[in-house]
Structure formats: C-alpha cells, structure tokens
C-alpha cells in the first residue's frame, strides 16, 4: 500500500541521513552486561538505585528521567525482603527494626537532588480505573486525535514527593511493528 511505501521510504531516509545530534549534553545511561555482573539481575534494590542516582547527580546531571515504573514497594531490600523467608511475624518484626526501608533511601536521594522525572503507566482495563489528579485540559474539551486510556498506574507516592514531575511513555507501533511517533498528550 501507499502507507507502507511511505513508512519504508521514511525508514530508509533515516538510515542514510539520520538527524544530527542536537546536543552532546544529553546522555542516556543504560544498564549494561557489566552492570548486571556488578549488581546482579534486575530489578536492583532501591538503595543501589539511590547510590547510582547520587553518582549521577554528583556528576552534574541536571535532569534524570527514570523510564522504569516504581509502583510497588522494593521487595529486594528492607522489611519487604524479610517476607521471602519463613519466620514468625514476631521474629520478622524484630529483624525489621534493624533494616532500613530501601524505598525511603531512594525517595531521599530523589528529594535531595530535585532533578528527577518518574514514570507512570497507562491502563486500558476498565475494571482498574485509577483517578487522575491534575488535568491539563479542561473537562468537556473534545480532542479526537488523543490516545485514550481508562486509568493510570502511578509511582509510589513517597517517591513522587521530591520529583520534578511524572511522565508517561506510550508507544503506538505502526502496522509493521515499528514505532515512528509518540503522543505528546494522552486522555485518561
């Protein structure tokens, strides 16, 4: 079809003459094989993320965008970690008194740096609607071109307190399974 030809032509032009880098000040930090060898499999305990975040901030990072959803408590550290061991609630509580809540450590690092944008996720399941808090467009305004979702999955509240903002990463692949565009706004 004409649409497929247009997509393939666009892809070809992107390969032979890609856009020039806008700035060398933007750095994408990825998890590599050597990181996995050093820290173990993903997900990492949040106290490790707090240390890595502090290193980014100390290195001069002005903005850190986590493209990972932190919607649940860290089960790899602190009191949550104790739940994976068979013991009585009394023993678990006594041991828990000596452990630091790793989510609080990560929240502290986020709050101290004042340079974080966290991620939320969207839901299409009508049975699990989570209300939004701050609309940026008034109710009743019809924008038929917006992608529409029934709710969001926000990050943990105590992580968002010190964050600059919360973003959403929504992709909509074309029929050939290639993502060529992303929406700037969505309707929830």
Q: What kind of feature is each model-predicted range?
A:
Residues 1-188:
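Non-transmembrane functional regions of envelope-associated proteins
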């Amino acid at each position: 079809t004409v649409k497929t030809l247009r997509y393939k032509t666009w892809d070809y032009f992107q390969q032979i003459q890609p856009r020039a880098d806008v700035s060398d000040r933007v750095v994408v930090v990825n998890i590599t094989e050597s990181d996995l060898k050093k820290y173990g499999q993903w997900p990492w305990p949040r106290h490790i993320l707090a240390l890595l975040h502090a290193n980014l901030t100390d290195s001069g990072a002005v903005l850190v965008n986590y493209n990972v959803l932190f919607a649940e408590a860290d089960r790899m550290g602190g009191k949550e970690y104790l739940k994976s061991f068979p013991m009585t609630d009394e023993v678990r509580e006594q041991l828990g008194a000596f452990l630091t809540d790793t989510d609080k450590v990560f929240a502290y690092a986020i709050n101290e740096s004042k340079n974080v944008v966290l991620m939320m996720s969207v839901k299409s399941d009508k049975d699990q609607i989570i209300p939004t808090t701050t609309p940026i467009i008034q109710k009743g305004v019809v924008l038929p071109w917006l992608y529409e979702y029934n709710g969001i999955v926000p990050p943990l509240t105590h992580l968002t307190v010190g964050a600059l903002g919360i973003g959403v990463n929504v992709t909509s692949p074309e029929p050939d399974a290639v993502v060529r565009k992303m929406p700037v706004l969505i309707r929830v």
